[in-house]
Amino acid sequence: YRGEAMQITTYLEHAARHELSANVIDLCPVGALTNRPYAFEARPWELKKTLSIDVSDALGANIRLDSRGREVLRILPRVNDDVNEEWLSDKARFMVDGLTKRRLDKPWLRRDGKLEAASWEEAFAAVARINPGSSVAVVAGDMLDCETMFAGKKLANALGSSLLEGRQTGLAYDCTNLAAVNFNTGLAGIETADVLLIVGSHVRWEAAVLNPRLRKAAKNGAKVFVVGPEWETTYPATFLGDDLAVLNKLPKDVTEALKAAQRPALIAGGAALR
């Protein structure tokens, strides 16, 4: 019932521990559930809206960046039924915090075994003292822009080195046959699969927005099998083991399910290629 003494509060017994939990911000019809990092930061009419793509995972969710001046203040999902529908992962939504408050904005040098903040002058002086040769390596981060990586390449070449790396995992992907690496069924098509085999992928963390589509497929009767370390799924799934050797001799129920399937789907993660 409603009355003057009624209070609306949080449900304290269970926290919303989910990689898509912040979508309640978009679902709330009255604005009572708000984006805490963005709250009281700006008015909507002050913001410049830029259409973009989420780069926090390989899914490529459609997003909108709201900025004021040079500062990005919030990230919102854009509707694209073929990719992310109207959803956005918490990782993508709140990565805006790392653009301003929690980022490396100065060089660091290792002195006496410890990393210490330094000025750009000190950093460039340290680089200038490096003896030219093949012992110098340049490692680029996952989120670096092309201009910065090109500058790093020129610096390495000037130091007489060709040791360049931009893959944090060290994996080498063969792109000669793109059909082998693309999600060739389309993301929306995964919902119609009748058997799903997931190899080396923690889908909930690696592609959070894809996981609800797998759940839809499972609710429609699809059988889900996973090769890799166990993780907490949101749908019934059978874990076959964390060794790729399992693929050489799959259990009988798995082979029979794959043989009878009309729309089987295979999802291979980066861990499957290590």
What are these regions (language model features)?
Residues 5-9, 23-27:
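C-type cytochrome heme c attachment motif
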Residues 14-17, 21, 25, 32-274:
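Catalytic alpha/large subunits of respiratory electron-transfer oxidoreductases
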Residues 1-8, 170-173:
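Short, conserved phosphate-binding/catalytic loop or strand-edge motifs used
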